[in-house]
Amino acid sequence: MFLLYKKKKVFESPFYYFPLSPETSFLCIMKGMTLKENIIQLAHSIGISKIGFTTADDFAYLEKSLRLAVEEGRNSGFEHKNIEERIHPKLSLSSAKTIISIAVAYPHKLKQQPQKTAYKRGKFTPNSWGLDYHYVLQDKLNRLAAGIEEMTRDFEYKGMVDTGALVDTAVAQRAG
């Protein structure tokens, strides 16, 4: 299992220790676990709620529906314009073999409910509470990547938080 220690400690145990970041002193890798198992443990230790893995194979089945959406004017304007880049992950990173998809849960209940009044009140969506989710997720991706770099050689990555070329929902579905 992965353990992150805030204070430097030394133990006699079946772990490898690596410096990880200023916030945490050590990244602890359990001998005998697969790289995937170590990555999952790391993800959970830095606050990633869900993590999935999939191949960097093409999403060719999306091509027809993506082109139709453009023709019918059903795009929101936030989608990446190049459909080829949306369905071929290796156009974003030619060395890609695996795509890691993460999810972080939002707080969904107020710690203290507002008092009922005669006046109507609006509600804000939970994903607008606190920091912009783009920054939160990018930070988690960067921390995950730093940990993976400590575990493996020749690691190359490109992080995307719904601003990249790939279709996020398709990646997440295939990654489980």
Give the location of each predicted region.
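Positively charged N-terminal leader segments that act as targeting/secretion signals
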Residues: 6-26
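Auxiliary alpha/beta "docking" domains used to position bulky ligands
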Residues: 31-176
